[in-house]
Regions:
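Alpha-helical segment of the N-proximal tetratricopeptide repeat
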Residues: 107-129
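Gram-positive cell-envelope targeting signals
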Residues: 5-11
């Protein structure tokens, strides 16, 4: 009984200490928010480029003092909040100078060198959140770290910052895996690099070399999103991939890239493909718009026994060309009451939303 009572007392004491810590953190945050947030936001959105001295004066901040880590953690939180709400309006030069005034780079590098594992990971994520900086000399020790989360966070930050060979890890490790979250983060990094004027890599080499199916698919998607038309001839080799998913994504991308040379191959392989890939082929042919595939689309509709595939074919015909619309009308006149609804759905997409 005494042991149980002691355990309860210990739990209550821990809860009180935890609550007190949260209260203290909240109080510190509120104090910093009241003192800095509005002026930091105003400086960040000011179209005039301000000097370090001007910003320090407006913030009433003494740059000679050594800032405390707890204070700087809150400052980075405020910077993150400003960036997340006003990203497209920010004067990046002023935003970066605020970081100089508070010595944020020094703080982040010290967190990476001396902080706990959690602090290190948070610092790495912060660099991306606030477009901060840490030297490659500090980052390099974590790029091959045995801890997966720390290693990946360091690699993504390196990709964010480096102008050298930031994606070398995909060359070095063909078995490098990507989770869904990793793919989202990597795409955000690519968008950031494009925005700041860094070169976009050619993705096709990793489609060819990666041993991981989802990594191949990710880079095929990026080829499409970045319209890397020069990669189309090599990407066309993926039409022979054993994976249905890789094959389908390659077909979709080749259509969006308008790689017309692939159309005969798509028509040739159509009949032996699973239904999902057949639909991708039809959509790709619709994107290519060569005006040479009307006969194929007509026959494909006539032979299709899957309603989903029939609908994709009708949509392709309807949007293909003037001759495509005539072919659509011709098929509609022949339609029985059972299939007439497919034509109505194609001509009036709102029906899909109302049903």
């Amino acid at each position: 009984m005494a042991t149980g009572t002691a355990g309860i007392k210990h739990l209550l004491l821990y809860s009180l200490e935890h609550a007190d810590l949260l209260f203290t953190q909240k109080r510190r945050y509120n104090k910093a928010f009241d003192k800095y947030y509005e002026e930091m936001k105003s400086i960040s959105l000011d179209s005039n480029t301000l000097s370090e001295e001007e910003i320090a004066d407006r913030l009433e901040y003494d740059t000679k003092k050594r800032p405390k880590p707890n204070e700087l953690r809150i400052i980075t939180q405020l910077l993150t909040e400003i960036k997340s709400v006003h990203e497209d309006e920010i004067n990046e030069l002023n935003y970066q100078t605020i970081q100089t005034v508070f010595q944020i780079t020094r703080f982040l590098e010290r967190e990476l060198q001396f902080g706990s594992k959690r602090s290190k990971i948070q610092a790495l994520k912060l660099i991306q959140s606030i477009n901060g900086y840490a030297s490659e000399a500090v980052l390099v020790r974590f790029l091959y770290h045995r801890e997966l989360e720390l290693r990946n966070s360091a690699r993504y930050t390196y990709m964010w910052l480096s102008q050298g060979d930031p994606f070398r890890f995909f060359d070095e490790d063909i078995g490098m895996k990507l989770r869904q979250w990793d793919m989202m983060e990597l795409h955000a990094i690519l968008e950031h690099r494009k925005k700041v004027g860094y070169n976009t890599p050619t993705f096709i080499k990793w489609v060819n070399t990666s041993a991981e199916e989802n990594v191949k698919i990710f880079f095929i998607n990026e080829i499409r999103l970045y319209n890397e038309t020069e990669s189309a001839p090599i990407l066309a080799k993926q039409l022979n991939a054993r994976s249905v998913e890789i094959r389908g994504e390659a077909i979709k991308t080749l259509g969006k890239l308008k790689y017309k040379e692939v159309e005969p191959k798509l028509i040739e392989m159509y009949n032996v493909q699973p239904e999902e890939v057949k639909r991708q082929i039809i959509s790709a042919i619709a994107d290519l718009k060569t005006d040479k595939a009307l006969g194929f689309l007509y026959n494909a509709y006539d032979e299709a026994d899957n309603w989903g595939t029939k609908r994709v074919i009708l949509k392709a015909l309807y949007e293909y060309s003037a001759m495509g619309r005539k072919t659509f009308d011709q098929l509609e006149r022949k339609a029985d009451s059972h299939t007439a609804i497919l034509f109505a759905h194609t001509k009036h997409p709102l029906i899909n939303q109302l049903n």
